[in-house]
Amino acid sequence: GSRDSTLTKMKELAAAHDNVRYISFSRNFGKEAAMYAGLSHTTGDLVIVMDADLQHPPAMIPEMMKGIEEGYDCAAARRTTRAGESKIRSAFSNLFYRLSNHMTDVKMPQAAVDFRIMTRQMVDSILKLSEVERFSKGIFAWVGFDTKWYPYENVERTMGTTKWSFRGLFKYAIDGITSFS
């Protein structure tokens, strides 16, 4: 779904390196579909999920690996700040977590993000779920694997702008709450 030169660069990398693969969609099907497709094509013992816009700092990966080495099935990040976001978006995000944790049986830490390292066992459990409308943050919590949380300070995007509209985020929040209530 990306409209920049990402696909061209991925094709070049895949041609040069046998261990690089990519998935290309005919259009933008959304973050959840992209994550599910990515997870379903993984083969390794460990899987890292992170945003490509560098809002999830790759430099955290070695520290997060320590959680996996300690025996956790998941090492995940959560924001300590919401730098780069409007106050209204931050307020609605905080409200979402409070409502979701109050109204559902799935408890998600405040400011949890999708940036995480997961074991193959956890990924396989996620892939067995048949949800059509997926809400990954909830699914990651619902499958019940031990998770170690790593705080990080949110950073502003280095390039581009978010494609999430307020309406899209609101629908995503409603889907997240109704999926687990």
Name these PLM-found stretches.
Residues 12-13, 19-27, 31-41, 46, ...:
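Acceptor/aglycone-binding surface of glycosyltransferases and processive sugar-polymer synthases
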Residues 27, 52-54, 152:
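Short, conserved catalytic or interaction motifs in soluble domains
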Residues 137, 149-150:
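Beta-strand scaffold of nucleotide-dependent catalytic cores
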Residues 145-147, 153:
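Histidine/lysine/aspartate-rich catalytic loop segments that bind and position anionic ligands
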Residues 174, 178-181:
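Alpha-helical membrane-interface segments at transmembrane helix boundaries
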